[in-house]
Regions:
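Amphipathic, Lys/Arg-enriched alpha-helical "gate/interface" segment within cytosolic domains
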Residues: 1-126
Length: 126
């Protein structure tokens, strides 16, 4: 499985990690698992580590995921920090996700630095 979802009790952040190729079905499964972990742990803060993501899904898949996330009452308000992948193609997909999700009312921001992403999520200053 190219993704995992865990809850970090120390920071109160749901952490989703993506590695390699992520199919459209895996993207939607990861989204559902992230929303469930957010609900179960009463956290609206998500760190999506896409730094090792390559590709596997399309802009349409991301658009559909943004629509689904915004339509789920368990996601609002949601604050998600996304660690940008090193792959240029995957980085473009993250940029699209940031725009599509933000346009639907989610707070999404892309980062290249994990510490900065966590600081934004938790309100801490690095």
């Amino acid at each position: 499985m190219p993704w995992s979802v865990d809850f970090d009790a120390a920071t109160g952040v749901v952490q989703s990690v993506f590695v390699g190729e992520l199919s459209p079905a895996e993207l939607m499964a990861a989204l559902a698992a992230t929303i469930e972990a957010s609900r179960n742990n009463e956290s609206r803060r998500v760190l999506a580590d896409c730094s090792a993501l390559t590709t596997g899904h399309s802009l349409v898949d991301l658009y559909d995921a943004a629509v689904a996330a915004a339509a789920d009452p368990n996601t609002l308000p949601l604050r998600e920090a996304v660690l940008v992948p090193t792959s240029a193609e995957a980085a473009d997909l993250v940029s699209f996700w940031e725009t599509a999700a933000t346009n639907r009312g989610l707070q999404v921001r892309a980062f290249t630095d994990r510490a900065e992403a966590l600081a934004w999520l938790t309100g801490a200053r690095p």
